[in-house]
């Protein structure tokens, strides 16, 4: 997998996957410096950008840490106590769509995080919905964010 990173424009691992790729031990607690070092190690594998999901520095918060060259950023958002299956795939898909439309790293991170959070918020109060998130109601917002056009 590490060899494939040399050919990637962007890699989008969660924290566990990022540690495995970088050959670093996984830790339950970490600092901003730890994540900065992890992003640097991922960039040394060769991708143009590295984006790590599931990074939280404060209780009740999670977010996205990303780096490309000398640009580094962190985009925080609310963390919910429930587990929502498929959110990594939702995030990666939304990020890729924004990135391929020419959005910057910062904008792609933001658009994908906001969309994923909207999908979670559409789902979190439905105890019968156990098999993923309700992504369809937020698609119009995603399209508008990526294209800058009202999809209606």
Locate each region found by the language model:
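Charged C-terminal helix
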Residues: 106-152
């Amino acid at each position: 997998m590490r060899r494939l990173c040399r050919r990637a424009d962007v890699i989008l691992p969660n924290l566990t996957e990022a540690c495995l790729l970088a050959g670093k031990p996984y830790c339950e607690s970490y600092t901003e410096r730890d994540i900065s070092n992890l992003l640097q190690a991922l960039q040394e594998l060769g991708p143009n950008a590295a984006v790590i999901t599931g990074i939280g520095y404060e209780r009740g918060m999670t977010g996205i840490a990303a780096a490309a060259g000398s640009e580094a950023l962190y985009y925080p958002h609310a963390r919910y106590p429930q587990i929502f299956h498929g959110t990594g795939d939702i995030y990666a898909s939304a990020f890729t769509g924004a990135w391929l439309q020419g959005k910057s790293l910062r904008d792609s991170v933001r658009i994908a995080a906001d969309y994923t959070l909207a999908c979670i918020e559409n789902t979190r109060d439905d105890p019968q919905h156990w098999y993923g998130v309700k992504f369809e109601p937020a698609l119009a917002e995603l399209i508008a964010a990526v294209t800058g056009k009202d999809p209606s």
